[in-house]
Structure formats: C-alpha cells, structure tokens
Amino acid sequence: MHGVLAVFTAVAMLSGCAGDRDRSNDPRATPPWLYEKAQDSIKSTNYTNAIFFLEQLESRFPFSDEAKQGQLDLMYVYYRDGQFESAIDAADNFVRENPTHPRVDYAYYIEGLSHYDPSRGVLERLFRVDTTMRPPVGALEAFTAFSTLVDRFPNSEYAPDATQRIKFLRNRLARYEAHIAEYYIRRGAYVGALRRLHRIIETYYGSDSTYWALEMMLESYRELGLGDLAADTERLLEENAHLKNSKS
C-alpha cells in the first residue's frame, strides 16, 4: 500500500511540474509567478525546473523587477547543476551589463567557483593526487576572478572564501610554472627558465615556490654570466628569507 501511495505521489509531483511549465508559456504568467516557481524549485534542488523558469523570466521579462535577481539566481543554479560554462557565461554577461550593480561581487564569485571546481580535477579532489605537472585548465581564470573580487570588494561577504581559494590557486599555478622552469634548467635552457621564474615572482609572489624560484634565478644568472643580476637576486633572497623552505 505504501508503495502504491509513493508512486501516486511521484506522479502527482511530476504532473504539477509539467503543469507549471505549461503555464509558464501562458501570456498571463507574470514575472513574480515565474520567480516564485524558480525559488520553489531551487529549494527542492530541482535545478532543471529552476533553470527553465529563470530562463523564461530572463527572456520574456528582461526589464522586470525580478529580472536582475533572476540573473544572479540563474548563474548560481547553473553552477550547482554542474553547468559550469553556462554559469561562467551568465556571470560574464552580468558583470559586463551591470558593472555598478550592488551584487556584482557575487557574479565574480560564481565565475571564480565555476572555473575553480573543474580546475581541480577528479584525481585531485578524490585521491589528493598532485596534478600540478598538468596544465591548470581553468585555474588561471579562477585566480583572476577571485583576485578581482577581493581587490574591488575587500569587504564583500564572499571575500574571505575567495582569499582562501586564491592561496590554493596561487600555489598551484606557481608550481606548474616551477615544473616548466625545472625542465628548462635540466637542459641548460636558462633564458627559458628565467621567463618562468620571473612569472612566479611577479604574478604569484608569496606562493610556496617563491623562495625556490629566487634560488633558481640566482643559479641561472650565474650560469649565464650575468653577475649584476645575480647580485640583485642574492639581495632578494636575503629580503625573502622568511619564505625559505616553503616549497614542498
């Protein structure tokens, strides 16, 4: 009996969803109604329905009071549904069209998250495998989005979490550059190595590869016979002694 009731309940719920979708195409469907249905779907984690209602709201009522909040909700739902590219596109569009909106910080946050999650990869997330020797797909974009958020909106409620993610990404991106620099150094290609080492210092300063990069710069300058630059690098090593032994 309980099984029969469960089946009837599921059928009724599906019928209700279908009915709401049918009504969304009715000219009498209003922005508040579409937004309410989207919120109900989000609360029940029915992201497919939420996306449907929010997309209807955006396409049919772009100038309604609910439209802007609907756009923010839509990028969130795309992200939660694993549609990262759609979330990134929605966030980019929102930032471009609403640069002074009071919640534009949230758009940067969602953009960063949508690049960040895929950038870590399944092996790294599940088995803690070091994937820093592989190209960090999405990591640089996530780093840029989170950095923009923290720089432009230091008091944002999303800034603390973004800051923690920046630390992780800074280390990851720097380690990737370090692997390439090591490859060049092993082959005596010191000019190529220096390009990567400079990037670690200039772009990812404070990462756990910073002091190591300075040491490798010193070695490279000496190998190239560039005494003045080697001396400058020695001074930088002294100034950054607090970062010694940070590279694992």
Regions found by a protein language model. Name each.
Residues 1-17:
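Sec-dependent bacterial lipoprotein signal peptides
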Residues 16-248:
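Acidic, polar-rich low-complexity tracts and alpha-helical solenoid repeat scaffolds
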